[in-house]
């Protein structure tokens, strides 16, 4: 998938058990939103309709994950002594901050219904060759999904902040072990070199990385476009910002709301050094799931990270004074990941790799409704 001449197609992926968007890596960094715009401009009606269907597919992966995370975060609070009444108050306080710009009370299932129905209307307009109306509908659909996605992220973040406030930062690692183990089994267990050839796994790893960040609507205009660089030994993805943790610590430039550490939210970021924040302060709790999921868990299970993550930190800027971008690195040979990336999560690089070589125990099956197999 390094040939820049590959066309964009929507095809079934056997490793993922569902359809995905294929094309060159240069093409993968272009959002599905932008691809639909281009197809409409070119009057490629059939292709535009296919992409419109897939835009909702991308969104559905993110939406489905939050349907698991939110109840699991609530359950973690209950399992650690938070009463039903206190939990209800926590939820009510979070939700009171998530009203939509027009003043409507936030309702996740209703908002997702709007995403689905607006997607259907977009496809109808495309099939009727109504280019101008389809462009306007696409803008509305993207904005409806952004509002849905961002409030789910806010809901999860408010719960994470409540966990830290009541149980301390040390609870974050236990929290993630409860919340993201299903995601690890569903998506990341397939990146074990003792089970699958890395040459095949790397393509799949890159595909789901690109798909996920398009679905999260990364980028300053929240379209899902990002940077992708290929070097001799790795792929580098950069998000400015990512649509979840990056937006959390920057604030919402579209709706004009501040970083979630500021009023009216007042949610926390890491203030203590831990392996899952690279022993740094200012890492948002949401971003620590990437370190736990993509670095720590696979290092402990396979002997290598599946991605090396450099999250932004609250209040930290680059040399120009601009907010720091989030960066992911995926190595073409996972056994060649430099030692420094192990040290910053308190690990030592092993001499053998793969779950069998390390004697890793078997994991259970996924018990939540996820689309496909990853």
Predicted features along the sequence, with ranges:
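An acidic-aromatic pocket/loop used at catalytic or ligand-binding sites
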Residues: 328
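A structural motif corresponding to the C-terminal end of an alpha-helix
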Residues: 297-303
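N-terminal accessory segment detector
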Residues: 2-293, 304-325, 333-374
